[in-house]
Amino acid sequence: MANSNPKLLVTQNPFSVFLLTFLLLITNVKSDSFSFNFPKFDTDTKSIIIDGDANTTNGVLQLTKKDQLGNPSPHSFGLSFFLGAIHLSDKQSGKVADFTTEFSFVVNPKGSQLHGDGFTFFIASLDYEFPEKSSDGGFLGLFDKESAFNTSQNSIVAVEFDSFRNEWDPQIAGNSPHIGIDINTIRSSATALWPIDRVPEGSIGKAHISYNPASKKLTALVTYLNGPVIEETAVSYTVDFAAILPEYVLVGFSGATGELAETHDILSWSFTSNL
């Protein structure tokens, strides 16, 4: 079992690709079995990079900006990821890691019936170029208008928690929020309804995301406890990680608001992989 222990690294400007790649390579996860667990986030949290509007406050990782009253700010985007290059696959042996990640989160519209835009859990190449601007709104902090649909340019897989339907999103049920699996583009390959509007405002959601290399199945399960009722949804998609992503990757979160806003708070996060 391996782990990495640099201090929390906070930036005000997007990373240089060369600097980021260097930092990640010197903190490579060498072990075939790897895990980390963050029961909360604060300034003493190790091995986490935050960038853009992301911040840590009172043990919570806030992906997008809030005002002094805790209300969400429009046109905000931020990201956070683990400072360590995760060994996802081995070309020589042909092996691909299985992994499981779990996190608890709150997306709160603060009284607004219409809200947006959402957040993602992502797995990306070490040299993935996160946009320096124009990645708010429906681009969810991962893409801009130039990269959002250019599948040959990107090397990223994401599970999106999308609370506002844009023109590229599927019409599952009107403008209902949805979760989706994105492969190198903001246009989801598979989607399912996200029951955020059916639970009380401020409810804690729990996400369980896993990958099975034998079946090449990526699965995301989201659960809310709504009194005696369990609100649950799941989405899965077959994807060959070895064909989409390099041997070493980074894992993390992004979030964004547009004209409409909501909070995007990660309360806890764990990750386990076995190659």
Swiss-Prot record:
SUPFAM superfamilies named among the record's database cross-references: Concanavalin A-like lectins/glucanases
GO biological process assignments: response to symbiotic fungus
Signal peptide start and end residues: 1-31
Gene3D superfamilies, sorted: 2.60.120.200
Induction details: Accumulates in roots during colonization by arbuscular mycorrhizal (AM) fungi (e.g. Glomus intraradices).
InterPro entries: ConA-like_dom_sf, L-lectin, Lectin_LegA_CS, Lectin_legB_Mn/Ca_BS, Legume_lectin_dom, Leguminous_Lectin
Superkingdom of origin organism: Eukaryota
Annotated glycan sites: 55, 150
UniProt KW keywords: Glycoprotein, Lectin, Signal
MF-aspect GO terms: carbohydrate binding
Function, in words: May be involved in arbuscular mycorrhizal (AM) symbiosis with AM fungi.
PANTHER family tied to this protein: CONCANAVALIN A-LIKE LECTIN FAMILY PROTEIN (PTHR32401), LECTIN 5 (PTHR32401:SF14)
Family recorded in the similarity comment: Belongs to the leguminous lectin family.
Name this protein carries in UniProt: Lectin 8
Species of the source: Medicago truncatula
